[in-house]
A protein has these predicted regions:
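Class I S-adenosyl-L-methionine
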Residues: 1-202
């Protein structure tokens, strides 16, 4: 998360959704987590640059498909902290999704420029991967430029949202910070996911 291209700038803005980044708080609380994030990011950047995204996708898809076979994992959240390291990473995950058709992929991102560029170049995005674009500020409307979006609302505004066929509220915060059986973020029929506030004050 400390190496996020867009997020590192958004953290400086008072009303941005990255202001109280949970991954950064975890990194500050546990040094080993910070070192792990940093190492993994550097390894990914190096692999994409040195081997190219097709080869990295081949390796990653082997790992991901193996997880399904051995652990029954059918849903893959891309990035539990941080964001894409480059446009190449988006290309890589598209290829992984093509190779792992029986699994669903969800990639939350604020790397608007890289994603926009990739989407212009790749016309056949596999149906089992969702690149869900987060609006940068709290209470900002969904970014309609992108098909799949997410927003973070203050509690009062979140409470006023009514679920529709294409807009759903995330309820993980109220069920032990766990998705449980919910897969709204992975569902191509859900265009907008609304999150409650992560933290309101410093």
């Amino acid at each position: 998360p400390e190496q996020c291209n867009t997020g590192s700038e958004l953290r400086k803005i008072a009303d941005s959704v990255c202001r109280f980044c949970y991954s950064m708080r975890l990194c500050n609380f546990r040094k080993n987590v910070k070192l792990s994030y940093r190492r993994n990011t550097e390894l990914l950047i190096s692999a994409l640059d040195d081997m190219g995204y097709p080869r990295v996708a081949e390796i990653m898809s082997f790992i991901v498909c193996k997880k399904k076979q051995t652990m029954g994992i059918t849903k893959v959240r891309i990035k539990d902290g941080g964001d894409a390291v480059s446009e190449l990473e988006f290309f890589m995950w598209v290829e992984v999704a093509r190779r792992c058709r029986e699994q669903k992929f969800w990639c939350p991102t604020k790397e608007y420029g890289w994603l926009r560029s990739m989407l212009r170049k790749v016309k056949d995005i596999p149906p089992n991967i969702i690149f869900r674009v987060s609006s940068p500020k709290v209470n900002q409307l969904p970014m309609k430029e992108f098909k799949y979006r997410s927003v973070v609302y203050t509690q009062d505004r979140y409470d006023d949202v009514i679920d529709t066929e294409s807009t759903k509220k995330c309820r993980a915060k109220y069920q032990g910070n766990a998705c449980l059986e919910c897969d709204y973020c992975y569902d191509p029929k859900i265009y907008t996911v609304v999150y409650p506030p992560n933290r309101i004050k410093e």
